[in-house]
């Protein structure tokens, strides 16, 4: 038997002229509600046999695909990190107890506290 160049799988008939695709049945199967489908074949008939396969195989849409995180994404900042930054912002802006002010040329000067 000579190789025909086509894969031999159970979804296609052996003799293509023997069976004609029933498009009405194909449309009925397509418009059924989405259900889990474990069909691994990528032939034209299997790509269009249900809406889920059409989305996955025909259009390439995948739902709930999570990105893999690299090994260095959860590195901690030394010295407290975000908590230290939050405390500094709270002290400087909300309580107005920061003793430094920034001048126009970018230098910092010490501010004297006004005591009442």
Curated annotation (Swiss-Prot):
Gene (name only): tat
Locations listed in the record: Host nucleus, Host nucleolus
Assigned protein family: Belongs to the lentiviruses Tat family.
RNA-binding keyword on record: yes
Cross-referenced Gene3D superfamilies: Tat domain (4.10.20.10)
Oligomer status and interactors: Interacts with host CCNT1. Associates with the P-TEFb complex composed at least of Tat, P-TEFb (CDK9 and CCNT1), TAR RNA, RNA Pol II. Interacts with CCNT2; the resulting complex is unable to bind to TAR RNA.
Region feature Cysteine-rich, mapped onto this chain: 37-53
Record's protein name: Protein Tat
GO process annotations (BP): positive regulation of viral transcription
Motif Nuclear localization signal, and RNA-binding (TAR), residue numbers: 65-73
Keyword Transcription: yes
Function as written in the Swiss-Prot or TrEMBL entry: Transcriptional activator that increases RNA Pol II processivity, thereby increasing the level of full-length viral transcripts. Recognizes a hairpin structure at the 5'-LTR of the nascent viral mRNAs referred to as the transactivation responsive RNA element (TAR) and recruits the cyclin T1-CDK9 complex (P-TEFb complex) that will in turn hyperphosphorylate the RNA polymerase II to allow efficient elongation. The CDK9 component of P-TEFb and other Tat-activated kinases hyperphosphorylate the C-terminus of RNA Pol II that becomes stabilized and much more processive. Extracellular circulating Tat can be endocytosed by surrounding uninfected cells via the binding to several surface receptors. Endosomal low pH allows Tat to cross the endosome membrane to enter the cytosol and eventually further translocate into the nucleus, thereby inducing severe cell dysfunctions ranging from cell activation to cell death. Through.
One Pfam family this sequence matches: Tat
Record keywords: Activator, Host nucleus, Host-virus interaction, RNA-binding, Transcription, Transcription regulation
Span list, region Core: 54-64
A GO term, aspect molecular function: RNA-binding transcription regulator activity
GO cellular component, one term: host cell nucleolus
């Amino acid at each position: 038997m000579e190789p025909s160049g086509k894969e031999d799988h159970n979804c296609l008939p052996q003799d293509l002229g023997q069976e004609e695709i029933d498009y009405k049945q194909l449309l009925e199967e397509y418009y059924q509600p989405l259900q889990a489908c474990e069909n691994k074949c990528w032939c034209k008939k299997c790509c269009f046999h249900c809406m889920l396969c059409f989305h996955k195989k025909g259009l390439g849409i995948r739902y709930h695909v999570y990105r893999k995180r690299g090994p260095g994404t959860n590195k901690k900042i030394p010295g407290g990190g975000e908590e230290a930054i939050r405390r500094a912002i709270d002290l400087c802006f909300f309580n107005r107890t920061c003793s430094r002010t920034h001048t126009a040329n970018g230098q910092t000067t010490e501010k004297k506290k006004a005591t009442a």
